[in-house]
C-alpha cells in the first residue's frame, strides 16, 4: 500500500479534507483495496513504473519553495467545487496501479509505516533545523552587515533575490504584500518599497515572496508566521535588504526608526525626543532678578568688602533668601562693573569737571563732622583715623536717616586700600590731572589747526 499514492506530500492536506478521493498510504484498510479493484479506468499504457514507490530526496535549494505551487492551485480549485461521489470523470488525473498491490500487501505493513513516519519526522526536523538556508549563512559570513545600532533579523534582512512564479497560473490569485497588512502606510514606507534601487524585472524582493501569507499558500511554512508585535519583527518586516553603501545604510536606519515610531504597537520614540527637547529648554538658566532690598544689602556689603569669605557669604544667603552661588556670581559681576567704571573714569574723555563731579558723591558736604566737634585739618589727619567719614550713614553717631538699618563699621583694615579714593586730596589731584590733560589736548589741537590753515 505504500506505493499506491503517486502524489504524496508531507502536509497531507489534500488527503485530510477530501475523503471522496483515492486513499493515501495511511489508509491501509480493506476499503482501499476494494476501491482500487472496483475502478476500471486504469490503462497500462499510461503506467509509469518510476512514479511510485520512490520518494525523492529532500532538497533545500531555492527551487524547493515553489515545488508544490501547482499542487496548491489544484487544491484550491477542488475546494471551490462541491463534494461528490467518486466517479471516473471526477478524478481523471490519478492513475491507479493495481499490479503491485498483492506484492506489497504480502509484506508486513507495520515496519514500512513506521519507517515512513520516521522519515517524515526526520524531514520535518531537518526543515526546522535549516530554516535559515546555507546560502543565507554564506551571504552573511561573506558580506556581514557592519556598524548597526540595532539587532538585525537575519531571516528577513538577507540579500536574496528569487525568481517570480509563472504568471499564467498565479496572475490573478496572488495575495497582497505582507507590508500592506502590517506596515504603516506612510509616505516613507511607500517610497522605500517603490525605490529605484530595487530590481523591477524578473527578480523580486525577498519579502515579496517569503511573506508568511505566501509561504502558507505554497505549503512550505512549517512554523507559524511571526506576529508583528516585537520591535525586532516589526522593524525587520518593514525593510527588505540591508544597505550596501553608507548613504543607503543611513537611509535604511532612518526608515527603521520612522516606521517603528509610527506603528501602533511600537514604542513612541518621538515622545522621548520631545521630552529631551523640553528638558533642554527647561535646563537653560533664566536671568536672576533681585529685589530692591536684596540689591541694597548686597551693595552695602560690597562697599565694605569687595571679597567676602565663605562664612559671610553663607550668612548673607540665609538673610536674603538666596543661594551662595547667586551671591558669589553677584559679587563677581559687581567687581567687573566697578573695574569698568574706574577704567572709564580714568580715560581722557571722562575727565571733565562737571561729569566727574556728578559721578562722585558730595564729599564736601558729607565730610563735615558735626559742628560741636572741632574741624580737623584734612592734610594732617591720617587715613586710619576716620576711615568712614565720607559715609556717615553707616556710623551710629550721624544725624541723617536712611531706609536701611544702622550697622557698626567693620575693622578699619578692611577698607584702608579704598579710603584714599574718597578723600578731598585725591579728588583735587584728579581734577588737576584732568585739567593738565585738557590743556595738552587744546595745545595739540591749536598746533594742528595752525599747520592746516597757514599753508605756504
From Swiss-Prot:
Residues 421-443 have a biased composition (Low complexity). GO terms for molecular function: DNA-binding transcription factor activity, RNA polymerase II-specific; RNA polymerase II cis-regulatory region sequence-specific DNA binding. Keywords: Developmental protein, DNA-binding, Homeobox, Nucleus, Pair-rule protein, Phosphoprotein, Transcription, Transcription regulation. Residues 338-380, 400-456 are annotated as: Disordered. It is found in: Nucleus. Pfam families: FTZ, Homeodomain. Residues 444-456 have a biased composition (Polar residues). GO terms for cellular component: nucleus. GO terms for biological process: negative regulation of transcription by RNA polymerase II; periodic partitioning by pair rule gene. PANTHER family: HOMEOBOX PROTEIN HOX, HOMEOTIC PROTEIN ANTENNAPEDIA-RELATED. This is Segmentation protein fushi tarazu. It comes from Drosophila hydei. The lineage of its organism: Eukaryota, Metazoa, Ecdysozoa, Arthropoda, Hexapoda.
